[in-house]
């Protein structure tokens, strides 16, 4: 059972690393508000390591790692991470360029079937900057689809042998045995020089939706912003704590308690 977020619990956890989702966790109503962006800077200036973990595309992640106060970004649901090594941007992918090209060709078949069989669905507007997956929009730029339509989209991916995960705005699908948590493990071992099982003792994860459940499972300390509440009954693994506020305001609430 998730608990209300409390600064005393966070203090005892001795947190140094913040892994956070972006959409509806850092953002509010599709925008990164000033208070949440300031909270990122407050964490950075206090010495925390910040790693966004998102389903957003490679093109967005390039900008995020260059312009936000973060140490790395894990994108497209674990397909890669970007970080700086010194002054040079480093990109780590789970597969080769040839494999990515072949997978995109297979995903185009899924795209055609989804658009034909699920009226009202659309390819996500950020698809043109994606390298690993296919994102189907069910509420970002289209009228919100119902749960049955979302489940139908997932089943089409799975019928084609692809992995499918539901975020707060998209159904993301891809080919390959990877996830957000698998790339978090790779990042910890490669860039931090320690296994995730050691890093997680001083780390927390922040999220808002069912595709964050593996991270809720594997992190010792996890936080759900309050909009996670509508999904809780469907989650086997729930966040340790829940904020009072939604989205970016919930993230700010968390940061204020961390820095108290």
Question: How would you label these PLM feature ranges?
Answer:
Residues 18-20, 73-74, 205:
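Residue-level marker for buried hydrophobic side chains located in beta-strands
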Residues 1-20:
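Non-catalytic pre-domain segments flanking phosphatase-related domains
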Residues 8, 13, 33, 181-260:
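Mg2+-dependent phosphoryl-transfer enzymes with acidic/Ser/Thr/Gly-rich catalytic loops
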Residues 29-126:
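Active-site phosphate-binding/coordination module
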């Amino acid at each position: 059972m998730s608990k209300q977020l409390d600064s005393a619990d966070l203090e005892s956890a001795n947190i140094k690393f913040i892994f956070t989702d972006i959409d509806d966790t850092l953002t509010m109503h599709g925008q990164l508000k000033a208070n949440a962006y300031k909270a990122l800077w407050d964490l950075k200036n206090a010495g925390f390591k910040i790693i966004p973990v998102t389903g957003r595309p490679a093109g967005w992640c390039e900008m995020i790692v260059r312009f936000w106060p973060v140490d790395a970004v894990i994108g497209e649901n674990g397909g890669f991470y970007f970080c700086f090594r010194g002054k040079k941007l480093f990109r780590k992918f789970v597969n080769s360029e040839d494999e990515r090209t072949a997978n995109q060709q297979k995903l185009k078949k899924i795209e055609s079937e989804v658009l034909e069989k699920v009226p009202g669905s659309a390819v996500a507007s950020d698809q043109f900057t994606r390298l690993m997956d296919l994102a189907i929009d069910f509420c970002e730029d289209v009228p919100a689809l119902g749960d049955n339509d979302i489940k139908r989209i997932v089943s089409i991916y799975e019928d084609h042998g692809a992995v499918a995960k539901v975020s707060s705005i998209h159904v993301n699908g891809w080919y390959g045995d990877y996830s957000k948590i698998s790339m978090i493990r790779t990042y910890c071992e490669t860039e931090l020089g320690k296994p995730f099982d050691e890093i997680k003792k001083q780390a927390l994860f922040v999220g808002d939706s069912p595709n964050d459940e593996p991270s809720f499972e594997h992190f010792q300390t996890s936080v759900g912003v309050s909009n996670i509440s509508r999904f809780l009954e469907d989650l086997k693994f729930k966040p340790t704590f829940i904020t009072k506020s939604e989205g970016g305001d919930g993230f700010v609430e968390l940061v204020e308690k961390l820095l108290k």
